[in-house]
Amino acid sequence: AGAATFIAEYSPKNHRGFYCSMVPASTAVGLLVGSLFATWMFNTFGASSDFVVNWGWRIPFVLAGPLGIGAYFVNIQLEDSPTYQAMQRALKDAEASGAAGAPERPIHCLFTKHLRKLIISIGAAMLNAVGFYVVLTYLPVYLETAVMMPKNEASLITTIALVTYVAFIFASGHLSDKFGRKKMLITAAAGFVVFTIPAFWLLNTLDFFTILVVELVMCLMLTINDGTLSSYLCETFPTDVRYSGFALSFNLANAIFGGSASYISFALINVTGDPIAPAYYMVFIAVLALGAMIASHEHTGKDLSEV
């Protein structure tokens, strides 16, 4: 949330979607590096080898440590965005003139003044929370356990999907600058409503290339959503609650719906005996996200100080 807010407030308004798409792209790059490493290990040593099981899986975590340290030092050198600094100056001027009372806490302000925006934003973020998990995390496990695909093939498909995700998410951000955030997010939600159940049927064909095409189509639908979501959330809330509104809506959606997606998916399979039961949950979430976006307002191209 912080990274997206920072980028959005620094970006030119007609390219905000493109620049904000760097945030989900950077997340996917981390997953891509991990997937490439896993694919290499599985093909070189075997998925069940002592090297992989005992300590090979730890190597990506060790390599990520220095990146976190580097990010910390970059972060402490950054200055607040011009939009935020302008808000701070306005508050100080108001206090100096005696026109302002005590500043309201952001969380309290969200629930008292921006509750509708918060609820809609949670609905919009739900598709990312569940869609990202289902497409890029759950499906590899599903292919191995339900479709009985070899781990190295499932890992290869995931790697190709992640490359596609990173490549197209910038295009999605750019298109959202051209066509608007609302249209893009509605398109993504509608795509998941229509395509998810047939996609799970096709996954059970056991044909590698059919499964790959299905995964890529779902991945492209996800990029339409994820490449747009960050800029949409930043444009939904005014500067004084922008970070809090983004963080609360996005993280609540991920904690409640994305975090439970694994348990719900496997529980649905166990209860119904239907191997494509997780698709029904994905469609349910997509319907909720679609409703939220239909009820939302378009803010594409606005100056963030005007939101």
What is each of the regions a protein language model found here?
Residues A1-A25:
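Cytoplasmic helix-loop-helix junction between adjacent transmembrane helices
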Residues G17-N43, L67, S249-A261:
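Glycine-rich segments within core transmembrane alpha-helices of 12-TM secondary carriers
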Residues T27-N75:
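Helix-loop-helix hairpin linking two adjacent transmembrane segments in secondary transporters
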Residues A71-L78, Y232, V283-V307:
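Multi-pass alpha-helical transporter architecture, strongest
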Residues H114-Y165, F257-S262:
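Extracytoplasmic gate region of multi-pass secondary transporters
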Residues K178-A189:
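Cytoplasmic membrane-interface "Motif A"-like loop-to-helix N-cap segments
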Residues A190-L206:
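C-terminal ends and interior cores of transmembrane alpha-helices
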Residues T236-T272:
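A late C-terminal transmembrane helix in Major Facilitator Superfamily
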